[in-house]
């Protein structure tokens, strides 16, 4: 867990005095970098009693073909380009907006796989 509250340090280097304890709603989590590989998902309870599916790895994507108007489940070969980070393409990290190479062509990821537990994409070639 990561605490996302205000720092105790002032810009001058001094300390702010503590007015209260840390609160549970100020906590966050480490980000999950979804990789290509055997499917691994973890169910995590979030605020309001809801759940998020953290996707650690997956080798299939639901790709929408706009010409045919159909969605096909295809195997992900690699990450071609990722605008989120320079080195994500090299490490095969899948995020929203990443361009992935699939068995039917290149596709752009349209969802947030690390928070939704599935990879959805739209065919671009």
From Swiss-Prot:
It holds the Pfam family Ribosomal_S8e. One of its GO terms (biological process) is translation. One of its GO terms (cellular component) is ribonucleoprotein complex. One of its GO terms (molecular function) is structural constituent of ribosome. Residues 1-20 are annotated as: Disordered. Part of the 30S ribosomal subunit. Belongs to the eukaryotic ribosomal protein eS8 family. This is Small ribosomal subunit protein eS8. It comes from Archaeoglobus fulgidus (strain ATCC 49558 / DSM 4304 / JCM 9628 / NBRC 100126 / VC-16). The lineage of its organism: Archaea, Methanobacteriati, Methanobacteriota, Archaeoglobi, Archaeoglobales. The gene is rps8e.
């Amino acid at each position: 867990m990561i605490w996302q509250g205000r720092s105790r340090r002032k810009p001058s280097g001094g300390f702010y005095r503590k007015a209260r304890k840390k609160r549970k709603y100020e906590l966050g989590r480490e980000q999950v970098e979804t990789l290509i590989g055997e499917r691994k998902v973890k169910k995590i309870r979030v605020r309001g009693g809801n759940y998020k599916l953290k996707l650690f790895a997956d080798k299939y994507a639901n790709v929408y073909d706009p010409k045919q108007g159909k969605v096909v489940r295809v195997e992900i070969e690699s990450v071609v380009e990722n605008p989120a980070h320079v080195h994500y393409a090299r490490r095969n990290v899948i995020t929203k907006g990443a361009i992935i190479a699939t068995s039917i062509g290149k596709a752009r990821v349209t969802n947030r796989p690390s928070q939704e537990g599935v990879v959805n994409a739209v065919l671009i070639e």
